[in-house]
Amino acid sequence: MALISIALLAPSHLSGQSGGDRLILFGDVVYFYPPGHARNCLLNNQFKRGEPVGFRMNAINPATGKRDRATELVVHLNFAGKTIDLPMRDRQNERQPEREFWVAKWIVPDDAPMGIVRYTVTAKDPQGRTGEFKPFEVQASQITIVP
């Protein structure tokens, strides 16, 4: 019984996220080829120059367990000594109401150096709550530019 009480009182963390009033962010990285392409939306972390990297994320209000479509999400890519900010867009629409997430696309530049591309995603909702997603610090799971 004591172990159950301790587990219930311990803070909960989701992929490095803190509780309270901070937004909870989660998502994945995929190929973002056009619809109908065999590799479109296929989970991946190794990309070649010229390939489309897709970021799919969600931001949840911990108090309600729901997302606010007006929340703004931004992918922050760090590579080749610079940071690129990619605003995300809400993917949900009338024809596809089940797509309750945000997306951003980045084409790997032709001059991108081989190796790991670090990224984070930040979010801010209309009420001022914020959140941040950082992938696990495991090199094999990072976005990697390959030959």
Which sequence ranges carry the predicted segments?
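Bacterial N-terminal signal peptides
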Residues: 1-10
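Short, compositionally biased P/S/T/A/G/V-rich stretches that sit at domain boundaries
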Residues: 14-54, 59-62, 143-147
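Extracellular Ig-like/FN3 beta-sandwich strand-entry sites
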Residues: 50-52, 114-118
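Hydrophobic beta-strand positions in extracellular immunoglobulin-like domains
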Residues: 59, 106-108, 123
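Short flexible loop/turn segments that cap and initiate beta-strands
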Residues: 59-87
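Short, solvent-exposed loop/turn segments at the edges of extracellular beta-sandwich modules
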Residues: 63, 126-130
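Aromatic sugar-binding surface patches on proteins
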Residues: 94-106, 113-115
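Short beta-strand elements
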Residues: 129-147
